[in-house]
Amino acid sequence: MLAPTESTLLFDGPSALTRTLLITEGPSETNPQKQALTMSATVRNDGAVIAEDSFEVNPASAYPTSGRQGLGYVLPYNPERRSYPFYDPLADLVVPLDYLGAGWVAGLETYRYTATIDVPEYHAERTIDVERRTGRLLDESWTITRGPLKGLYTLSDESKAAAASAALHDVHILKSLQVMAFVTRLVSALALFYAFVLLVRRRRD
């Protein structure tokens, strides 16, 4: 489930590439009476802004609530092994984000996806690894052959370590919730069984 936060990813490559993601909560643009989450991203190359993006997002699905199609910068909880519509802000285009297979990053099992963006002014291959239960981004690479920058950009070790730490925290919370759900079901089942035993005894008496 998405929540208000701010993070910056650093990429190693021919130039200093960063992407800052900001999730805020406030009145919805379409219905000011309701609260909504807004996801905003800023991509910088050597400090200069080369792309900006902002949209209201469904906290459960990670999809935009209106205005455009395609996932932005996170995948849903429990991502599926299939293609997703993916929005690239540099090309202002929605393209397929195809499932490649399973992988590992920092000891965490991932699902790997790739997207090809090809327009006259921009061509790139983007590959991402997300933690298979939470959908949190753990690794990413851009191979750009045409556009405002060129070359291979990979997520820095610092950003990968921070992402892995956050994903591990999410996984622990998820496991705790699963244990609590199991215990709750078990207690409920025992309570029903005890009530049944009491009922049988009363009828015998």
Residue ranges and their predicted role:
Residues M1-R81, K150, L155-A162, L168-L174, ...:
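Extracellular or lumenal secretory-pathway regions
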Residues Y73, Y77-E80, Y84-T184:
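Acidic, serine/threonine-rich low-complexity disordered tracts
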Residues G107, R203-D205:
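Generic ordered-secondary-structure signal
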Residues S176-L198:
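Membrane-embedded transmembrane helical bundles of large multi-pass transporters/channels
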